[in-house]
Each structure stands twice: as structure tokens, then as C-alpha cells.
A protein has these predicted regions:
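N-terminal acidic, glycine/proline-rich low-complexity segments
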Residues: 1-243
Length: 243
């Protein structure tokens, strides 16, 4: 979909290389307006501009990666888009934050531990409801193979990523584990009828590991094994690849 604002972190941020090289393929195959990160605006500016223009309590933010940009957003100051601080702006405009993050009831998960300070900033200070889809939720739901085998879908960046990456990892032989997709599913369609919520609070240690404090109710997570309806019918996630 064209016209989606894109921002990048302009300060300290992780740099990870794509060892499977699907990103190289996408850049070579598909047109794109930005030639480098230097041409993109600061992600915090994109967030502030976008949030300021939305109705109050109307925005669902879904994150399927590191919390770097959201941590920076919370610490941002008033600017030309809003007289509110980052935390005030989030509280006014955001309805819920949905995250693919953490491992429950405890563990160490990639999206949280690689930028532990940003994760602590977000989970200690985010002023709206937070819903977490943990590692264990997407681990048993495999997707991608139906998309790869569907010859009617052409010129699809998402299909290309699955086509390139799945054969390169033995654990993906039955399909890619669907960590990010499950978070997007509940962000777009809600957690019902597939899940119930468990209230608590995500606690992130300095080393990036996490625990779940059931005595507090700031956050919610999707407990237990994924419903068999999702495991059996990954077409619940399939439309995300085609839109």
C-alpha cells in the first residue's frame, strides 16, 4: 500500500544484518521512494505527527520488533505537531498498544532483550492498556507454505520473503512460526473468540529477560497454548499476506 509514512531511529539503535538476504531481493525487485535511511524522517517525528492528527483514544499501535522508537516517543518533548509531551500525547490519542514481546510466565525473548533499556522504558511508563502476545503464542502456529504454493499470487513482497527464508531454516519446514502475525491478528480483530486475557504486568530486567507480576494489572497477555482453531486454520492469518 503506497503512502504509508516510514520513519527510522535517528539516535542510538540496533543494527542487525539479514543473513538470509530476502531484504536484498525486495530492494532489487520492487520500487521504493527511499534509497537509504538517511532520507527517512525520525520515527519519533512520524509518530508525533500521526498521533496528533488522530481523534482521541482512537489509535491502536502494534509493535512486532524492538521497542526503541516507542521508548523514544515516550521521552519526546513538545514540538510543532503537539504541545504535549510524548507520554501525554500517547495517553490522549492511543487506545491500546499490542506487542509481540516477551515469554510467559518468564523467559528471555528477542524483541525485548535486544534493547532492554527501551523495553523497560515502555513497559514501566506506557500510559494506556498494553496487550502482549508472547513467544509461546506464535511458536506453534505455522504459516507461509499456503502462500508460497499459491500460484495465483504474484509480485507479492510477503510471498517472496517466505519463499526465500523458509527453505533456509530446518525448523521452518512446516511453515514459519507466526509470532508477529498473532499480535497483528489480535490488534486488528481483537482477542475474542480465540483467547482469554490474563492481567498482570510485564517486568523487564536489566539483561532483557522478563517475568510476569500477577499482583499488578497494568498489562494483559494471551495465556496458554494457542487455540486449535488457529493452529488448524492458518487462513485466519492468511489474509494479512494478501492485502
Amino acid at each position: 500500500k503506497p503512502g504509508i509514512p516510514v520513519g527510522v531511529p535517528k539516535g542510538k539503535a540496533l543494527e542487525l544484518r539479514d543473513f538470509q538476504h530476502w531484504s536484498d531481493t525486495l530492494l532489487a525487485k520492487y520500487p521504493h521512494a527511499l534509497q537509504s535511511n538517511d532520507e527517512a524522517p525520525d520515527a519519533v517525528e512520524v509518530y508525533r505527527k500521526t498521533l496528533a492528527a488522530q481523534p482521541d483514544k482512537s489509535v491502536t499501535i502494534v509493535t512486532v520488533g524492538f521497542l526503541t522508537n516507542l521508548g523514544n516517543l515516550l521521552q519526546s518533548k513538545a514540538d510543532k505537531y503537539s504541545s504535549l509531551s510524548g507520554k501525554q500525547l500517547v495517553k490522549k490519542k492511543v487506545k491500546i498498544l499490542v506487542c509481540m514481546a516477551g515469554m510467559f510466565p518468564s523467559g528471555s525473548e528477542f524483541n525485548v532483550n535486544r534493547d532492554a533499556s527501551a523495553s523497560q522504558q515502555v513497559y514501566n511508563n506506557w500510559p494506556t492498556p498494553v496487550l502482549l502476545s508472547g513467544f509461546e503464542i506464535g511458536q506453534k502456529i505455522h504459516t507461509g507454505l499456503p502462500l508460497i504454493n499459491n500460484s495465483s499470487i504474484v509480485n507479492s513482497p510477503v510471498k517472496d520473503v517466505f519463499r526465500i527464508s523458509i527453505p533456509l531454516d530446518k525448523q521452518d519446514s512446516a511453515g514459519r512460526m507466526s509470532w508477529d502475525e498473532t499480535a497483528v491478528l489480535v490488534a486488528v480483530k481483537g482477542y475474542k473468540p480465540w483467547y482469554k486475557l490474563e492481567r498482570g504486568k510485564m517486568i523487564v530486567a536489566d539483561n532483557g529477560s522478563n517475568t510476569w507480576d500477577t499482583t499488578k494489572k497494568n498489562h494483559a497477555q494471551l495465556p496458554g497454548a494457542p487455540p486449535q482453531s488457529i493452529v488448524r486454520d492458518s487462513s485466519l492469518l492468511y489474509p494479512m499476506y494478501c492485502c
